[in-house]
């Protein structure tokens, strides 16, 4: 199996529903003293929703925490649980399943009664920025001995602070299709290796950096 890009017209309805859920999620989080913004991975450039063969369509979102009470920074389990509970509260239960806590994101499945054979995997990664401006992903180390079992940590995404500017430069030069193709190639490569340590945003940053340095260095 290998990933392929889903056409934008095909995914428009589902992006709209997911965006609505995440807008409500951010409103709920604000009432909990967490200020956050969400974005579809690769949004602002071109559609990067993928599908692995006949598997679920993948909608990958980043939820970037901009500001939060100190208690959340001191207790990352509390932060992730608060986001998960807000996401569950915001979801329309006739369409969405409850969010599951995976290693690097919250995952829920999206179903529609009029399209029973269509299933979407709706993944929400929790991010923030460090002092250097690079993104960091909230990771639940369920079985990583080096961190201690069942620990929560921030994991830096290298060379990610200016990924939007690099993507804009690539698009301006008419090279975005090459970046999209490389994104799909990398996702498929990691899939073939059964590598679960490279979620979509990490792969996106890798693809953008690779194409950027190929033409602009």
Regions found by a protein language model. Give the residues of each.
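Active-site nucleotide-donor binding segment shared across nucleotidyl transfer reactions
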Residues: 27-59, 63-73
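Charged/polar, solvent-exposed surface patches and flexible loops
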Residues: 16, 20-27, 81, 85, ...
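Conserved catalytic core of two-metal-ion nucleotidyltransferases
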Residues: 29-33, 77-132
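Alpha-helix boundary/N-cap detector
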Residues: 9, 13-16, 20, 74, ...
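Short C-terminal domain-edge/linker segments immediately following a structured domain
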Residues: 68-74, 92-95, 153-161
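Helical scaffold of the NTase/Pol beta-like nucleotidyltransferase catalytic core
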Residues: 1-40
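Short glycine-rich, low-complexity/disordered patches
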Residues: 25-41, 92-107, 194-206, 215-217
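Right-hand nucleic-acid polymerase module
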Residues: 102-105, 115-217
């Amino acid at each position: 199996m290998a990933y392929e890009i889903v056409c934008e017209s095909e995914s428009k309805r589902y992006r709209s529903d997911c965006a609505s859920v995440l807008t409500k999620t951010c409103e709920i989080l604000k009432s909990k003293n967490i200020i956050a913004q969400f974005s579809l991975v690769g949004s602002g450039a071109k559609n990067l929703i993928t599908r692995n063969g006949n598997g679920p369509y993948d909608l990958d979102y980043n939820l970037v925490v901009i500001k939060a009470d100190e208690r959340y920074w001191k207790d990352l389990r509390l932060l992730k649980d608060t986001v998960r509970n807000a996401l569950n509260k915001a979801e329309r239960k006739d369409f969405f399943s409850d969010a599951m806590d995976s290693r690097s994101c919250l995952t829920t499945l999206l179903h529609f009664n009029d399209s029973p054979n269509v299933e979407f995997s709706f993944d929400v990664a929790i991010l923030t920025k460090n002092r250097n401006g690079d993104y960091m992903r909230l990771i639940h180390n369920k079985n990583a001995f080096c961190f201690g079992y069942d620990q929560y940590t921030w994991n830096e995404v290298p060379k990610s602070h200016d990924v939007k500017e690099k993507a804009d430069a690539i698009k301006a030069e008419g090279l975005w299709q090459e970046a999209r193709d490389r994104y799909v190639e990398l996702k498929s490569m990691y899939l073939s290796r059964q590598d679960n340590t490279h979620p979509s945003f990490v792969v996106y940053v890798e693809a953008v950096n690779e194409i950027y340095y190929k033409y602009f260095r």
